[in-house]
Amino acid sequence: MHDLAVKWCVHIKMSETLLLLFLFALKHGVCDLALQAIYCRPSHKHIFLSPRAMMHSLHHGVGAWIVLIPFTNYLTAITFAVLDGVSHHLIDYSKSSIVRKKNWSLDGKMYWVATTVDQNLHFSVYFLIVYFVMIF
């Protein structure tokens, strides 16, 4: 009976973890595609304090808070939401600055390599957030 209970607890924790990762993926799509296209173009992300770039990062932070609040307490949700927004801003700023400095265009290979790195960094942040939320 004990083994069954342990398996059930592991299953529930794994289901919560996968759900949270899925919700972060949805949040990312909404914020990085739809909201950015509607509210943040042109974003001038290569300018560190660009208002539209800051709004884009705020969308990610608020989205992260909405995703996290059912899974954790208020303070933890706020902390990781701020981490998501700030890290998103720094990642986007870094990518945009490099792309602009190197003069890489949308139809060039290096732009898409930079975008791949950018997206992988964002999702790495999500994995870390989910990991820490789930272990505490």
Give the predicted meaning of each segment.
Residues 2-136:
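Hydrophobic alpha-helical transmembrane segments
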